[in-house]
């Protein structure tokens, strides 16, 4: 059995044998793949199965082992690039300029330099005059001090007063900030230098120098700032190849994680562009404006290394900073707009309600006046009916039979074609003649006669006004003759 399969797998817990070396190599490769990708597959969030967003990547980078992989993959390339850039820096001064920016005037009273030194050097030191490079005892840098200060990448992360964003510079050189009143400038060499981070356990972790990275926490301006392409009298900064991290108040693993997060975040945000300052990857020189930047505060944990801190009053120019500030201010602005819309809607509703109520009041007044007019007309008509009834009651016993017979023929002749009913005269005669014989009450008969006469008189007014007038005139004459 052992002679047929002489090749044995030396992995712990596996004693399989194979006939040839190729099968053993394939088997060992399976072991390596399992050991390498096993923890990632058992993780709660599987990056391969989901959309690889920056948030998920930054959340799970430590569990996946991203730091070790980056250090082992790019260490040689970054060391080689650092050596080449060191040779270039030693050959001649760097051209601290950006190609696409206009010029502004600057004060040249205190020129500053970019200095990079080994990790045991202090993180911040006052700058010497140009063409002289010497180490000075580190002093705490306060806001009111007029001396410029060199801050190495080791003293990053940046601590904001109110914003927990920690961006980093993707270069081994330093950011020079200065507090006295002067113009602000920023320069960048055309070449880029990588940054290799040496961790405490002996490993090195490179930071990828991607496209120009926006620095919202180090360089912040409230108005547009221009760049100076070439500064006479200031030599290029001598760059040390180590680019290592100087001691700071925070533990080194947290700095490494934070640097990686900030680099990835700025590489994503720099694609969208913005109106912020673009920082080159080799060196950046900044001189502050009097009303806008006092940005160096000594870190409370470390006595000598000074870490830049942005005052809360300065606006952050990059897209990420604006987005974060907008998110912070959004609730108040949304509430303000919501209240304004509510007030406008309430005022419009009140106006509509006032118009509706006023129209209802006008309509009610019109209907009330019309009702009063109609009631007055009804009262007048009732009074007229009462008067006519009294006249009929007064003349109910008049001997008008002969006169009615005479006028009957005259009244019926023009009404034969239009009105077949009889004239009121025979009705009066019939009622007056039949009232005593039937034994009815005189008043009830008079009311019935008056009602019928009024209805017929109303119908005859339009057609036979003259005969009715003669009849009305003749009735009192016959009454007076009878009396």
UniProtKB/Swiss-Prot annotation:
Assembly description: Homodimer; binds DNA as homodimer. Heterodimer; heterodimerizes with other members of ATF family and with JUN family members. Interacts with JNK2; the interaction does not phosphorylate ATF7 but acts as a docking site for other ATF-associated partners such as JUN family members. Interacts (via its transactivation domain) with TAF12 (isoforms TAFII15 and TAFII20); the interaction potentiates the transactivation activity (isoform TAFII20 only) and is inhibited by ATF7 sumoylation. Interacts with TAF4; the interaction inhibits the TAF12-dependent transactivation.
SUPFAM superfamilies for the chain: beta-beta-alpha zinc fingers, Leucine zipper domain
Modified residue annotations for Phosphothreonine: 51, 53, 101
Spans annotated as Disordered: 110-148, 299-345, 407-440, 464-483
Domain bZIP, chain residue ranges per copy: 332-395
Modification Phosphoserine, positions: 413, 423
Chain intervals for the UniProt region annotation (Basic motif): 334-354
Gene Ontology MF annotations: DNA binding; DNA-binding transcription factor activity; zinc ion binding
Segments for region (Transactivation domain): 1-285
GO CC annotation, single: chromosome, telomeric region
Chain intervals for the UniProt region annotation (Leucine-zipper): 360-388
PTM: On EGF stimulation, phosphorylated first on Thr-53 allowing subsequent phosphorylation on Thr-51. This latter phosphorylation prevents sumoylation, increases binding to TAF12 and enhances transcriptional activity. Social isolation stress as well as TNF-alpha also induce the phosphorylation of ATF7. Phosphorylated in proliferating colonic and small intestinal epithelial cells.
Keywords from the named record: Activator, Chromosome, DNA-binding, Isopeptide bond, Metal-binding, Nucleus, Phosphoprotein, Telomere, Transcription, Transcription regulation, Ubl conjugation, Zinc, Zinc-finger
Compartment(s) of residence: Nucleus; Nucleus, Nucleoplasm; Chromosome, Telomere
Domain of life, per lineage: Eukaryota
Family designation: Belongs to the bZIP family.
Linked residues for Glycyl lysine isopeptide (Lys-Gly) (interchain with G-Cter in SUMO1): 107
Zinc finger (C2H2-type) residue numbers: 7-31
Record's protein name: Cyclic AMP-dependent transcription factor ATF-7
Biased composition (Polar residues): 429-440
PANTHER family (UniProt xref): CYCLIC-AMP RESPONSE ELEMENT BINDING PROTEIN (PTHR19304)
Originating species: Pongo abelii
Protein purpose: Stress-responsive chromatin regulator that plays a role in various biological processes including innate immunological memory, adipocyte differentiation or telomerase regulation. In absence of stress, contributes to the formation of heterochromatin and heterochromatin-like structure by recruiting histone H3K9 tri- and di-methyltransferases thus silencing the transcription of target genes such as STAT1 in adipocytes, or genes involved in innate immunity in macrophages and adipocytes.
Biased composition, class Low complexity, residue ranges: 114-126, 307-320
Compositional bias segments (type: Basic and acidic residues): 326-343
Annotated disulfide bonds: none
Gene: ATF7
């Amino acid at each position: 059995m052992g002679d047929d399969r002489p090749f044995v797998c030396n992995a712990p817990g596996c004693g399989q044998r194979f006939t040839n070396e190729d099968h053993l190599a394939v088997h060992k490769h399976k072991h390596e793949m399992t050991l390498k990708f096993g923890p990632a597959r058992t993780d709660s969030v599987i990056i391969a199965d989901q959309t690889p967003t920056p948030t998920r990547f930054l959340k799970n980078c430590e569990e996946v082992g991203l730091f070790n992989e980056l250090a082992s993959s790019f260490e040689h390339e970054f060391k080689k690039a650092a050596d080449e850039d060191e040779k270039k820096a030693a050959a001649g001064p760097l051209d601290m300029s950006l190609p696409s920016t206009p010029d502004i005037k600057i004060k040249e009273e205190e020129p500053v330099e970019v200095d990079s030194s080994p990790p045991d050097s202090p993180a911040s030191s006052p700058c010497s005059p140009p063409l002289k490079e010497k180490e000075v005892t580190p002093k705490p840098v306060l806001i009111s001090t007029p001396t410029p200060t060199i801050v190495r990448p080791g003293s990053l992360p940046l601590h904001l007063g109110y914003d927990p964003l920690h961006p980093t510079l993707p270069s081994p050189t330093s950011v020079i900030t200065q507090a006295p009143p002067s113009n602000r400038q920023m320069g960048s060499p055309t070449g880029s230098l990588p940054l290799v981070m040496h961790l405490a356990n002996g490993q090195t972790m490179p930071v990828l120098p991607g496209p120009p990275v926006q620095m919202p926490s180090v360089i912040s301006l409230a108005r547009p700032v221009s760049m100076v392409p070439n500064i006479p009298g200031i030599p290029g900064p001598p760059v040390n190849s180590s680019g290592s991290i100087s001691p700071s108040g925070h533990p080194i693993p947290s700095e490494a994680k934070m640097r990686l997060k900030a680099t990835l975040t700025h590489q994503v945000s720099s694609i969208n562009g913005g109106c912020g300052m673009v920082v080159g990857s080799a060196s950046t020189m900044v001189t502050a404006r009097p009303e806008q930047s006092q940005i160096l505060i000594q870190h409370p944990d470390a006595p000598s290394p000074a870490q830049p801190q942005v005052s809360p009053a300065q606006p952050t120019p990059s897209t990420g900073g604006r987005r974060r500030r907008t998110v912070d201010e959004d609730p108040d602005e949304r509430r303000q707009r919501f209240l304004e819309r509510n007030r406008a809607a309430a005022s419009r509703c009140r106006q509509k309600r006032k118009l509706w109520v006023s129209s209802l009041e006008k309509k009610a007044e019109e209907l009330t006046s019309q009702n009063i007019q109609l009631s007055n007309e009804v009262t007048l008509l009732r009074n007229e009916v009462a008067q006519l009834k009294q006249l009929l009651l007064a003349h109910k016993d008049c001997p008008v039979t002969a006169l009615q017979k005479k006028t009957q023929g005259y009244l019926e002749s023009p009404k034969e074609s239009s009105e077949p009913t009889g004239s009121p005269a025979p009705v009066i005669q019939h009622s007056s003649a039949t009232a005593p014989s039937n034994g009815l009450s005189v008043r009830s008969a008079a009311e019935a006669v008056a009602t019928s006469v009024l209805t017929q008189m109303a119908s005859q007014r339009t057609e036979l006004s003259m005969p009715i007038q003669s009849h009305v005139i003749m009735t009192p004459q016959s009454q007076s003759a009878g009396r």
